[in-house]
């Protein structure tokens, strides 16, 4: 794991992922503020902007500043689409998909614009290259060695959300499944050092779906 300090005071990080609250983009400053406020009212301290969705608008970060919510900021990358798994529905080979996105220069330029847009928000805690799996090697190296040292040198950058810099969680498992429910006592008898970017939970289906 890693320790986090705010104004010199060590904090215990709790939080959740934020994945586009409205895919039709019917977003407003009021809606952003309400959703971040809900996060704060649950006594959560960090919110992760997940890499398979949007980078949010300044109004989102303004709300995080207001309510004291730290932001774990992913870039646009998700292990679901960059060749990490065999996928018979994809026309491109796995090797080709390792190089997604197609235009690396445009991706880097977009990251530079993003950094300039939100780097002055005190809520922004650290940068993460992608969800679960690193970006193409040349992009990752450019971000690590050139973009972030030049544009936001004081903040941490990790290549992907399950980077071993953050998590060596072998109990919850960083593998590809199949997944199941862990026995509760395991969490007290098995030593683990996680900073989990996400965790599965049991959801209750609606009654109508079971009739």
Language model feature labels by segment:
Residues 1-41:
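N-terminal carbohydrate-binding accessory modules
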Residues 46-211:
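Substrate-binding/catalytic cleft of secreted carbohydrate-active enzymes
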């Amino acid at each position: 794991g890693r320790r986090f300090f705010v104004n010199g005071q060590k904090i215990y990080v709790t939080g959740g992922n934020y994945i586009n609250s409205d895919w039709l983009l019917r977003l407003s400053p009021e809606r952003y503020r309400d959703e971040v406020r809900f996060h704060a009212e649950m006594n959560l301290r960090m919110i992760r902007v997940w890499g398979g969705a949007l980078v949010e608008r300044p109004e989102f970060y303004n709300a995080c500043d207001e309510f004291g919510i730290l932001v774990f900021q992913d870039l646009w990358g998700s292990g679901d689409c960059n060749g990490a798994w065999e996928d018979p529905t994809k026309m491109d080979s796995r090797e080709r998909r390792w190089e997604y996105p197609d235009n690396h220069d445009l991706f880097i330029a977009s990251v530079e614009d993003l950094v300039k847009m939100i780097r002055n928000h005190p809520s922004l805690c650290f940068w993460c290259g992608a969800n679960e799996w690193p970006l193409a090697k040349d992009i990752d190296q450019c971000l690590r060695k050139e973009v972030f040292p030049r544009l936001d040198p004081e903040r941490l950058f990790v290549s992907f959300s399950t980077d071993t810099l953050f998590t060596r969680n072998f109990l919850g498992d960083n593998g590809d499944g199949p997944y199941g429910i862990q026995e509760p006592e395991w969490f007290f008898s098995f030593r683990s050092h996680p900073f989990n970017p996400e965790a599965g939970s049991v959801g209750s289906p609606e009654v109508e779906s079971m009739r």
